[in-house]
Amino acid sequence: MFDTPEDIGLSLEREKIHRVRNLVYTHWHPDHTMGCRVLEQLNMDWLKPRARKVTNVWLPGWVRRDFHKHLGLESHFQHFEKLGIAKVREISEGEALHIDGITLRAFHMAQPGLTSFLLRHGRRRALLALDDTRDWRPGPELSEPDILVIEMGWFERDTKNRRIVSPGDPIRQGEASFEETLRLIGQIRPRLAFLTHIEGLWARSYNDYLKLEREYHDHHLRVAYDGLRVAF
């Protein structure tokens, strides 16, 4: 499992997942970490302490350092370790991590503390770049994956051509636009690109996004949704 947004418990229930052996974090931002207490719900049995389960929590070194600085995350996970329901482990950039037949490698991105992950299963490869891809320059080892999962990026205008991101808006300096995402997809050249981190701020319906898929069919786009399953 990658990251723990605040609604992660609902997602796991929907997919009927009741055991998570490995949890990987991409960065410290609250929308990716503030559901971490799900580990208590998954692993702790207060009436039968011996029945508790353990989840390995994998953190790239730079993410671990941010956990020490932000949101009390390091304290949270120290608490989970004391309860015996988590084991925090650090990984370095490019280090091969083998989990259930899948090899994962972490790569530092341009924005502070952000991580992309390359997954390999047999000859199949998936690249995850889930947030803050602005100024990211993926190396050649990340090119031509079978699957790319990447943030949608922001839109300057809504579907009626009304401006929703003003020229001086800070989002322009801190976040990648949809056009920047398209350029990244063109550089990476995946077989399929799944767009995620979709915000209601962009004032688009799912049907609007389906139109976007058709408009940019040459980029092999798919717009993600809750419950989407991808064979890998």
Question: Predicted regions span which residues?
Answer:
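Binuclear metal-dependent hydrolase catalytic cores
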Residues: 1-129, 135-138, 204-232
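Cap/insert and terminal regions of metallo-dependent hydrolase folds
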Residues: 135-228
